[in-house]
């Protein structure tokens, strides 16, 4: 068995791993490999003269009390079923950590994988706050009065998204993505028929990233306060449940300020793990291409 970086010539075989392990269709895989794959960010295990396991390592930055440190996010960790049980995922993660010389961050896809990654030296270090807003709550929310528009939903560029995001999530443990990563996250959200807005209101600007799911709306990221989020959802005439994900630190700030009692409906959810660093605790990891 050999571990090496993937090449473009391997893409058809890597797509087979991707499809068999994750079930994604050809059009999405083609989209991903067109926009995010490089021969410097994916490691594969070679067996029988073909790739049989893979892991992509995407660069990011961890904000700490002394600045920030480079990390890599391990994405799409997968092994063909007939080659499992040989420790290939562990080897790929160790090789990535050794090659890039940075801490490794990942999002476990299930609770059982949390225990698996703990055995490999990872620990839970990132979380989010989540809740579901029901249609009645949106209908009862205070919105704009007729003829007095307060919220302007504008197209957001990758540069604007990066700047607004970094200005909002400044706490220790924040995983900062660079412009390339944010550009892809916005492209993928658009591919999934999602929406990304820069919301101008009350002399400030906030972010709102969401997409439509079956009979629901999924807010993947926002910097809006709960009161402003409800007002924007009302302006958009949302009539279905809205599942919201926020930074836990942002929710706690709202609770301390006492501005929005609705923030108390949020529940903490463990979201991401790290190895090779003791700095992060209840940090904020998001836009993970889950």
Give the predicted meaning of each segment.
Residues 1-3:
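Extreme N-terminal starter segment of soluble prokaryotic enzymes
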Residues 11, 18-63, 172-196:
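Active-site rim helix/loop that mediates acceptor-substrate recognition in acyltransferases
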Residues 44, 50-61, 71-73, 78, ...:
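Conserved beta-strand in the GNAT
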Residues 76-79, 85-99, 225-237:
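Conserved acetyl-CoA-binding loop-helix of GNAT-fold acetyltransferases
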Residues 93, 99-110, 238-249:
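Conserved GNAT acetyl-CoA-binding A-motif
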Residues 118-142, 218-227, 233-290:
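Active-site/acyl-donor-binding loops of N-acyltransferases
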């Amino acid at each position: 068995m050999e571990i090496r970086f993937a090449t473009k010539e391997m893409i058809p075989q890597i797509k087979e791993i991707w499809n068999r392990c994750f079930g994604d269709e050809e059009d999405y895989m083609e989209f991903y490999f067109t926009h995010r794959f490089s021969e410097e960010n994916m490691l594969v295990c070679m067996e029988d003269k073909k790739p049989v396991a893979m892991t992509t390592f995407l660069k990011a930055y961890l904000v700490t009390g002394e600045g920030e440190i480079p990390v890599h996010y391990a994405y799409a960790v997968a092994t063909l079923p007939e080659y499992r049980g040989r420790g290939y995922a562990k080897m790929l993660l160790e090789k990535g950590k050794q090659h890039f010389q940075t801490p490794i961050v990942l999002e476990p896809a299930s609770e059982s994988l949390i225990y698996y990654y703990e055995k490999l030296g990872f620990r839970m270090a990132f979380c989010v706050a989540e809740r579901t807003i029901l249609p009645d709550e949106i209908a009862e929310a205070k919105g704009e009065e007729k003829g007095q528009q307060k919220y302007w939903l504008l197209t957001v560029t990758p540069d604007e998204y990066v700047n607004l995001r970094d200005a909002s999530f400044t706490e220790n443990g924040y995983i900062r993505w660079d412009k390339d990563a944010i550009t892809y996250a916005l492209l993928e959200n658009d591919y999934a028929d999602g929406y990304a807005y820069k919301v101008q209101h009350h002399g400030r600007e906030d972010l709102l990233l969401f997409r439509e799911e079956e009979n629901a709306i999924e807010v993947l990221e926002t910097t809006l306060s709960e009161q402003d989020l409800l007002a924007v959802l009302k302006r958009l005439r949302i009539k279905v449940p809205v599942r919201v994900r926020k930074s836990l630190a942002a929710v706690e700030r709202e609770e301390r300020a006492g501005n929005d009692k609705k923030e108390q409906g949020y529940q903490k959810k463990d979201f991401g793990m790290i190895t090779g660093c003791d700095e992060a605790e209840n940090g904020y990891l998001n836009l993970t291409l889950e």
